Each structure stands twice: as C-alpha cells, then as structure tokens.
Amino acid sequence: EMSEFYRRNDPTRLVHYEGVCNDRRYNDTSDMESRMYPSAAYVRDFLQKDRSKPYLLCEYTHAMGNSCGGMHKYTDLTDEEPLFQGGFIWDYIDQSIYHKDRYGKEVLGYGGDFDDRPCDYNFSGNGIAYGGERMPSPKMQEVKFNYQNISITIEKDSFTVNNKNLFTNTADYDCQITLTLDGKRIAASTIELAVEPLSQQTYQLPRWKYQTPWSTEEPWKVTAAGEYVVTVSFVLKEDTLWAKRGHEVAFGQGIY
C-alpha cells in the first residue's frame, strides 16, 4: 500500500525496497531488484534467469580498511549487462575525528579512542575519504579508475581509446602521453583525440627522440635498462566548477 501511495503522489520517482528478495509475495513493491553485497557472479546468474526488472546494489564494495580491490568485477558487469545498474558504495567518508593520542600527536580517532567501551572500534572507518579534511584515501583512486568513462588499453606500440560516454567526445579533453623510466619522466606529449561517444579508436604511440621500447628499428633495444611506463591520460582543458584545468578524468598505463 505504501509503494502505491508513492507512485500515485509522485510518479516521477522509482520505488526501491530491498526486502522483496526475502518475500516474493511483495515483488511488485519495488521497481527494481535490489540486494546488499551479492557477488558479481550472483548478479549475472540472477539476470540470466529473471529479466523482469533492472538490478541495483543498494550497498556494495564495503570500503573498510584495505578494500575495493575486487570492485572491477562489478563495473565490468555494468558494461556487459544492460540490466545491471551498478550500486552504492558503503561509504564515502570515515566516521573519525581528530584527537590527541597518548603521545600528544593529533590523529584521526575512532571507536575506543575516547574511553568508550563497548564500541565498534574501527568499524566506522569504512569510507573512501578520510575523516577530518576529507582527503582521498588510496581506495578513492581505485574507485575513480573503475568509474572512469574512458578506458585506455596500451599495446606494444599503440593504444586503444574506448569512449563509454553517452554524449561527450574525447576532444573535450586534452590527451597527455608520458614516458617514465624507473618513475622519472623522460618524455611527454599533449595531443587532441576525437573519439565519438560509445565508440573506440586505436592510435600509434609517439615517436620520441628518446629511444623507446616500441621503437620500430629495434623494438627492445632501449637506451637504458629499467622499468618503462607509458601513461595515457585525459585531462580537463579548462577550469570547471568542480575541478581545475589539468585534472585527470581517465588514464591507462602500459609497463615495459
């Protein structure tokens, strides 16, 4: 009755109710199928059998501690399965606040740091941003990479750009290509690539004066031994309300 009340009074909004997965008598309550923390394989199998509704993870990829490592399995599934609508990460910001430890050093504290017993200890530290100034954690870098709408695959002497955006051409960004040797930048180029939305294109890597691992003459005879990394990035051309010019929106890497 409550779901029908919502639909009558605001037909512009979808109705979500996770509980239908536990009692199918109320299946019409929710406009979408929803679960917390099923595996990507479970979602794929479910949608192969039941395609009556889109599937949404109302909570997934719990971002506690050293986590988010398997997130790509879900974002890969969004590319493969049109009925899978993604999910909501738990959660965005660590529930932690600054306080001084026993040595007088200011640190981010959580359960148990304030003589609070019993408590859940670090269970509140489950965000992709730290508490305090909301600085990004390493988990945020993983999330950003998995959510980027432009993917770059680097081969021996070329790279393929897959533009997953629905409306944005990659020409709206600058494409930066850098070569590093053992972490030190030794060559760089900025170019403009126009890959239409929902399409892909392959390009050759630059022919820098510095002999590279993909030089055509002797492909693997390089000037110096070490780890060569080529990075192809797409960055903002101009300042926006949410980020400055040069902010990276997508990247891909190849290691030689």
Model regions and ranges:
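Intrinsically disordered, low-complexity Pro/Gly/Ser/Thr-rich segments with frequent PxxP/GP/PP motifs
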Residues: 175, 179-244
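Extended substrate-binding grooves/exosites of carbohydrate-active enzymes
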Residues: 1-160, 165-185
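Short beta-strand elements
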Residues: 239-256
